[in-house]
């Protein structure tokens, strides 16, 4: 009798290797220059994601960090403050990009395995008329959480957070690098 032992490394999705089928698909894929919107694979992917999220368009980025940092830059001004969980990827694993790229500070909330609640966010919004504190302009969530061990937000809580952000004029960004896991 033989015993087959298979080792599965779940430390990160970056340690996986493509299967032969995946390699064959990559080698046979139709390609083009995505800069000129000529890559059918990228175009199809962006259209499918936009449709899935009921948005007019989507934009594919080569990395989650680049995506997050671009979103932060778009939604803030230098000197602003964003709200995130203390385990958040944008604070812990993006090389200080929030402050370096956008001149923004982070107000960290101690949530539950990387998830923060609408009530915690409400308590953390700086008073807009108090000029000694930075303007709160953005809330950043991560679903599923990385450092939180893959915890998943309850959809109702995300809706509460979204409504809170709208009420207070805050942008809301969801780091969805592991969204398909949710």
What feature does the model see in each segment?
Residues 102-163:
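PLP-dependent aminotransferase-class I/II
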């Amino acid at each position: 009798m033989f015993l087959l032992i298979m080792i599965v490394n779940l430390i990160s999705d970056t340690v996986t290797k493509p299967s032969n089928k995946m390699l064959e698909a990559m080698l046979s894929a139709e390609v083009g220059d995505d800069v000129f919107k000529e890559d059918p694979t990228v175009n199809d992917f962006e259209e499918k994601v936009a449709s899935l999220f009921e948005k007019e368009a989507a934009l594919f980025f080569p990395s989650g960090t680049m995506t997050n940092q671009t979103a932060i830059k778009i939604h803030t001004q230098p000197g602003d403050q964003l709200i995130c969980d203390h385990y958040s990827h944008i604070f812990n694993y993006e090389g200080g990009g929030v402050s370096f790229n956008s001149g923004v500070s982070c107000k960290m909330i101690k949530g539950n395995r990387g998830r923060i609640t609408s009530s915690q966010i409400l308590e953390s919004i700086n008073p807009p008329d108090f000029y000694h504190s930075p303007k709160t302009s953005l809330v950043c969530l991560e679903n599923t959480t990385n450092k939180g061990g893959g915890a998943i937000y309850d959809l109702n809580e995300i809706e509460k957070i979204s409504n809170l952000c709208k009420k207070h004029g805050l942008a809301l960004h969801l780091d969805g690098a592991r969204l398909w896991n949710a």
